[in-house]
């Protein structure tokens, strides 16, 4: 089996255009900004709202790579990060109102372990597979 590409190799191929003040375009209509300071899901969403946005929602494989690569560019490591999705009344939905149409769950997920995992993280240690976690965890995040 061939070794998977390194984050540096993967991210070198992802072209991102700056739109100023640490914001980068994730596609032609949306820009994103990474925040390293870990916050709970609600604290992170509140911060994004103060930036006139929401936690980032991912809709395509390319957007997942852009989000992962921003993490890599800022930290030179991949880690877990809040995304703008959560569970309400048993349904997973994006908090910006867009369709939850990109669901690359890690194996065995979502599992709602302990009955209290209502928020969604992208685990970029596993190249962006989604996992449901408790909303009280503190993670870095990205606003869009």
Curated annotation (Swiss-Prot):
<dbReference type="InterPro" id="IPR050111">
    <property type="entry name" value="C-type_lectin/snaclec_domain"/>
</dbReference>
<dbReference type="InterPro" id="IPR016187">
    <property type="entry name" value="CTDL_fold"/>
</dbReference>
<feature type="disulfide bond">
    <location>
        <begin position="119"/>
        <end position="135"/>
    </location>
</feature>
<comment type="function">
    <text>The role of this hemagglutinin in the venom is unknown, because it is masked by the high venom hemolytic activity. Lectin with specificity to galactose. Induces hemagglutination.</text>
</comment>
<dbReference type="InterPro" id="IPR018378">
    <property type="entry name" value="C-type_lectin_CS"/>
</dbReference>
<keyword id="KW-0964">Secreted</keyword>
<feature type="domain" description="C-type lectin">
    <location>
        <begin position="27"/>
        <end position="144"/>
    </location>
</feature>
<protein>
    <recommendedName>
        <fullName>C-type isolectin Sp-CL4</fullName>
    </recommendedName>
</protein>
<dbReference type="InterPro" id="IPR016186">
    <property type="entry name" value="C-type_lectin-like/link_sf"/>
</dbReference>
<dbReference type="GO" id="GO:0005576">
    <property type="term" value="C:extracellular region"/>
</dbReference>
<comment type="similarity">
    <text>Belongs to the true venom lectin family.</text>
</comment>
<dbReference type="Pfam" id="PF00059">
    <property type="entry name" value="Lectin_C"/>
</dbReference>
<keyword id="KW-0430">Lectin</keyword>
<dbReference type="InterPro" id="IPR001304">
    <property type="entry name" value="C-type_lectin-like"/>
</dbReference>
<keyword id="KW-1015">Disulfide bond</keyword>
<feature type="disulfide bond">
    <location>
        <begin position="48"/>
        <end position="143"/>
    </location>
</feature>
<dbReference type="GO" id="GO:0030246">
    <property type="term" value="F:carbohydrate binding"/>
</dbReference>
<keyword id="KW-0348">Hemagglutinin</keyword>
